[in-house]
Amino acid sequence: MSINSPQYSLPSKKEKQRVRELRKFINHHNYLYYTLDDPEISDSEYDKAFQELLTLENTFPSLKTNNSPTQKVGNNILKKLEEQPHRQRMYSLDNVFSNDEWEGFLKRLANALPEVPFSFWCDPKMDGLALELIYEKGQLTSALTRGDGDIGEVVTEAVRTISNIPKRLKHSINAPELLEIRGEVVISRADFKKLNKEQEKKKKKLFANPRNAASGSVRQLDPTITASRPLRFLAYGIGEIQPSSLKWNTYHELMSYLKEYGFETPPKGKLCISSTEVQSYYTRLQAQRYSLRYEIDGIVMKLDDIQSQEKLGYTSRAPRFAIAWKFPATQVQTRLLQIHIQVGRTGVLTPVAELEPINVGGATISRATLHNEDEIKNKDIRPGDMVIVQRAGDVIPEIVSPILSDRSAKSKPFVFPKICPVCHEKVYRINNEVAWRCINLSCPAIRLQSIIYFVSKSGLNIQGIGQRLIELLVTSGCIKTPADLFTLTTADLLTYKRMGAKLAAKTIQALSLAKQTMSLHRLICALGIRHVGEQTARILASSFIDLDALSSASLEDLQQLSEIGPEVASSIQAFFKNKANIQMINQFREMNIWPIQQVNDTTTKGFFTGKKLLFTGTLERPRAEMKRLAEEAGAIVMTGISHKLDYVIAGKNPGSKLNKAQELHISILDEPTFLQKLLIVL
């Protein structure tokens, strides 16, 4: 198709920028939700952003990339648990939100499978942690979380403590050689309330919702913690099965077999033989939603005929034969007491609504995000208003609108502050942004958040130094910049309550290790330069020998680099021109914290430069390290098998991906050969 044809249009600069903004927003909230189990926004806000990105990518196919969140499942996994690849990818589900969208899904099925009558296995969409149980000859041998879909966290010992998970399958004499059971770990509403009461008695942090409690309970290094939590596993499908001839004709038969093997399955599961039955099922479960034992946020429909499922296959992210129909967000009314302003790391002033506490779908809500001044004005939200609050099973809800009929005649519009509430300096709107910013880098709020970011996983990832310790160090005046962290002594730390000699020594040791192992790209990333994340930091580290070279780069020099436009270039230059930042960089130099460009960061062409690779099976080295080595050698690491791959690096027990690679005549390398070829320079 010609790009000049009427069916193909090129995106404008504004549309390209919007795609970048949406990807950054979605990736950030994926990390909070999947990795930290600590979501900040409602499902409906997330779904709205995801659907907008999906629409833009479908309208302008040139914008679609393999690393877009629309092409991936979940997020990276935490590093503290061992990781292991799935034999078969654990996919996510695409969503529909209305009857029209459901009908659209049916039309796509009909176009792909004409003249095939459709029946659907329907069950509730459970809101928990996705899990894979691996049985060999009927015996439970391992358990993995979904992770990023390709690689999961090994949680076998924790999972063995969940009472309703069979350690040995019923009728195990006839069990397959290998059977992977997939399902969801959940906590009932009643058990969740009891758990939070216990947390409260112990003066521990309360869990935000049952999903967070379930996820956090499974992802424990100490299985006794998991054992103390009221977890249940509900099985909804299978992964790999060997021998592969042992398969079922329909999904409802499979669900019956899961029960026979001893698994609990999602309640209210039903075979629906028509679209009308599916719609009735949706309406019925929506009405029963809050009377069910477990929290649900929609229903899942899968084609019942498994042969039809296999014909339809998968996209990079989700099956084509299944869909989740999400319930609308729960709405309630409460009083908006007042609006507070918070100041973040980049100086953004964020309004937060303080609400009269109200129960929404089993959770007590007392705060809601208002995002920015424009949202407050557009919705005409005022302190003292009765407001409609919307929550879709998450932590922070959103205010939909005020109830104008209840508004007092004395009500006044909220006036957004034009000075920073922390340092009392003037705030600005830069380049027509919606956000107001404090640009005073000496602002205590910015300084605090900058140092917290510096040591965080997104920064240097210094173990054992958390937000609370940074707050103590900053408020007491012990440190003022990230560089000051490396001047700390054990004696400094021992002046603080609850800081014993052992913990103080461990903290200093962690700082010393960070100083010794710091790479240039990691330091650039940790500086918290606006618009500079890990990928951009890598590009900068591969293009400039040290911070001096980067700080003296012109706008033209910066804009010549891939993925760096005028806005990012201006932000980088502004950072290095700031007096406080110049002083901090000089501090790093004086303390000999001065990483330089590594050999791996140069543009020397190696064996794998520009090649597309995929890792499968269990490797001797951690998967994350192998991925890093490949990327530093110039390779592109893929997650799915396709004819575009150049090499598959296979470890032990590679599963079906190896077979598919051989069918496509893709070159196969073992781990030692891969490591050997990394050293070849062309």
Swiss-Prot record:
Family to which this protein belongs: Belongs to the NAD-dependent DNA ligase family. LigA subfamily.
UniProt-listed SMART domains: BRCT, LIGANc
EC number: 6.5.1.2
Top-rank taxon, per record: Bacteria
Gene3D superfamilies, alphabetized: 5' to 3' exonuclease, C-terminal subdomain (1.10.150.20), 6.20.10.30, BRCT domain (3.40.50.10190), DNA ligase/mRNA capping enzyme (3.30.470.30), Helix hairpin bin (1.10.287.610), Nucleic acid-binding proteins (2.40.50.140)
Binding residue positions for NAD(+): D43, S44, E45, Y46, D47, S92, L93, D123, R146, E184, K302, K326
Keywords: DNA damage, DNA repair, DNA replication, Ligase, Magnesium, Manganese, Metal-binding, NAD, Zinc
Function recorded in the entry: DNA ligase that catalyzes the formation of phosphodiester linkages between 5'-phosphoryl and 3'-hydroxyl groups in double-stranded DNA using NAD as a coenzyme and as the energy source for the reaction. It is essential for DNA replication and repair of damaged DNA.
Cofactor: Mg(2+); Mn(2+)
Gene (UniProt): ligA
CDD domains: BRCT_DNA_ligase_like, LIGANc
Protein name according to UniProt: DNA ligase
GO-annotated biological processes: DNA repair; DNA replication
PANTHER family: CHROMOSOME TRANSMISSION FIDELITY FACTOR 18, DNA LIGASE
Active site: K125
Matching SUPFAM superfamilies: BRCT domain, DNA ligase/mRNA capping enzyme, catalytic domain, Nucleic acid-binding proteins, RuvA domain 2-like
Domain BRCT: 603-682
GO molecular function, one term: metal ion binding
Catalysed transformations (reactions): NAD(+) + (deoxyribonucleotide)n-3'-hydroxyl + 5'-phospho-(deoxyribonucleotide)m = (deoxyribonucleotide)n+m + AMP + beta-nicotinamide D-nucleotide
Gene source species: Lawsonia intracellularis (strain PHE/MN1-00)
Keyword Zinc-finger assigned: no
